[in-house]
């Protein structure tokens, strides 16, 4: 199940685990990424918490945790090569996997058409 946030994160939910990243729109707005800081595996976050940081040639920005949960995996490849987030934001450029506290909370997020409407 693919969901989006108003803060430009995407989630691909399989069972009770969500793979999280930033959208192509967000990556495009930021420009070429030069640095990514990811959370620690095992860290717990609440919806809206700062979970990761990205820095581009234009700006630094936070990546927010889209739902309550615990980090189960991080994508080390994007810390070594932040450009993966620009070139494949919804594929190889994912940030972390989150074991969701309550999968039903995802119902409050945007679907793809709702997100497209948000970004115009």
Swiss-Prot record:
Q: Which CDD domains match?
A: GCS_H (cd06848)
May I ask which residue range the UniProt record assigns to the signal sequence?
none
Q: How is the cofactor bound?
A: Binds 1 lipoyl cofactor covalently.
Coiled-coil positions are: none
SUPFAM superfamilies (alphabetical): Single hybrid motif
> GO CC terms on record?
cytoplasm; glycine cleavage complex
Q: What Pfam families has UniProt attached to this entry?
A: GCV_H (PF01597)
GO:BP terms for this protein?
A: glycine decarboxylation via glycine cleavage system
Q: Which HAMAP family match?
A: GcvH
Stated role = The glycine cleavage system catalyzes the degradation of glycine. The H protein shuttles the methylamine group of glycine from the P protein to the T protein.
Q: Print the keywords alphabetically.
A: Lipoyl
Q: Which InterPro entries does the record cross-reference, listed alphabetically?
A: 2-oxoA_DH_lipoyl-BS (IPR003016), Biotin_lipoyl (IPR000089), GCV_H (IPR002930), GCV_H/Fam206 (IPR033753), GCV_H_sub (IPR017453), Single_hybrid_motif (IPR011053)
UniProt-recorded name of the protein: Glycine cleavage system H protein
State the similarity comment: Belongs to the GcvH family.
List the gene name.
Answer: gcvH
* Residue ranges annotated for the Lipoyl-binding domain, each copy included: 17-99
Write down which residues bear the modification named N6-lipoyllysine: 58
Q: Which cofactor does it need?
A: (R)-lipoate
On assembly, the entry states: The glycine cleavage system is composed of four proteins: P, T, L and H.
């Amino acid at each position: 199940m693919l969901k989006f946030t108003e803060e430009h994160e995407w989630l691909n939910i399989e069972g009770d685990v969500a793979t999280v990243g930033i959208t192509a729109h967000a990556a495009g707005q930021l420009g070429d990424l030069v640095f990514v800081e990811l959370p620690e595996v095992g860290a717990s976050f609440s919806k809206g918490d700062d979970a990761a940081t990205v820095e581009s040639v234009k700006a630094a920005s936070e990546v927010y945790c889209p739902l309550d949960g615990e980090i189960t995996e991080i994508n080390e490849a994007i810390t070594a090569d932040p450009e993966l987030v620009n070139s494949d934001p919804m594929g190889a450029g994912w940030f972390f996997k989150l074991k969701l506290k309550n999968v039903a909370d995802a119902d409050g997020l945007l679907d793809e058409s709702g997100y497209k409407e948000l970004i115009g």
